């Protein structure tokens, strides 16, 4: 239930709270100073099914998951189904992207972007190390 195959375009992971704590961040134990737990950089898309901008972003993330397969993990968190994650990461507006580089501090990026803008963001924020 955690891994969703996206029409053959690549793997996009839908995160629930327990697997988020295990694979991305233990925000419960360290709410103000958590560390990224992954072995590849990741992008976490906080979204909702009713959000028009989120719907536009979703297929782009599916494409990027395929393009960056093996280099980057892309996760999706439905804030309607995961209110604890929404609250823990202070998500007030969606779409909201959490960028977790292997080294360095995670950052948030608010709003939607086209594919080229997202690729630039991934390259500069997550894969430039």
Segment roles from a protein language model:
Residues 1-13:
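Single conserved hydrophobic/aromatic residue that forms the stacking wall/gate
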Residues 18-21, 83-84, 116:
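Acidic phosphotransfer microenvironment of two-component signaling modules
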Residues 39-42, 46-50, 93:
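Short pre-active-site segment immediately N-terminal to redox-active cysteine/selenocysteine motifs
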């Amino acid at each position: 239930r955690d891994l969703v195959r996206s029409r053959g375009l690549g793997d996009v992971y839908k995160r629930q709270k327990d697997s988020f704590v295990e694979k991305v961040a233990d925000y419960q134990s360290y709410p103000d100073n958590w560390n990224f737990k992954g072995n590849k950089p990741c992008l976490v898309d906080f979204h909702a099914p009713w959000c028009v901008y989120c719907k536009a972003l979703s297929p782009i993330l599916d494409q990027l998951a395929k393009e960056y397969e093996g280099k980057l993990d892309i996760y999706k968190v439905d804030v309607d189904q995961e209110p604890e994650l929404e609250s823990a990461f202070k998500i007030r507006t969606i779409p909201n992207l959490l960028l977790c580089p292997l080294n360095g501090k995670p950052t948030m990026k608010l709003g939607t972007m086209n594919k080229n803008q997202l690729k630039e963001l991934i390259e500069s924020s997550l894969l430039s190390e």
